[in-house]
Amino acid sequence: MSFVTTRPDSIGETAANLHEIGVTMSAHDDGVTPLITNVESPAHDLVSIVTSMLFSMHGELYKAIARQAHVIHESFVQTLQTSKTSYWLTELANRAGTST
């Protein structure tokens, strides 16, 4: 019979690293949001005004997508953290079962 083992500690380290990446990405998104959602018109002609409005709308779309991505990212991190605990408990149960 073959056995599969995991390293729950490495799963936990991966979850922690991914969490830090998410924090960094969110901080970056928060920093650029005013710049990409309030694009100033370079001139007062109609084309410049419409173009700046278009860029601002794209900025709002980016902000909405970034929020959704953050929720998905945090859900993935939470899944990894839960998996770490599950794998750890399974490994303990397997060790207890094979040592008797």
From Swiss-Prot:
Q: What induces it?
A: Coexpressed with PPE17.
**One of this protein's GO BP terms?**
cell wall organization
Alphabetized SUPFAM superfamilies for the sequence: PE/PPE dimer-like (SSF140459)
What is seen without this gene?
Knock-down of the gene alters the colony morphology and slows down growth. Knock-down induces aggregation, early biofilm formation and changes in cell wall lipid composition. It also results in decreased survival of Mycobacterium inside macrophages and reduced necrotic death of THP-1 macrophages.
Primary localization class, coarse: secreted
Cross-referenced InterPro entries, in alphabetical order? PE-PGRS_N
Q: List the disulfide bonds.
A: none
Name where it's found.
Secreted, Cell wall
User: Which keywords appear in this protein's UniProt record, sorted alphabetically?
Assistant: Cell wall, Cell wall biogenesis/degradation, Hydrolase, Secreted, Virulence
Entry's family note: Belongs to the mycobacterial PE family.
Task: From the Swiss-Prot or TrEMBL record, give the protein name.
Answer: Esterase PE11
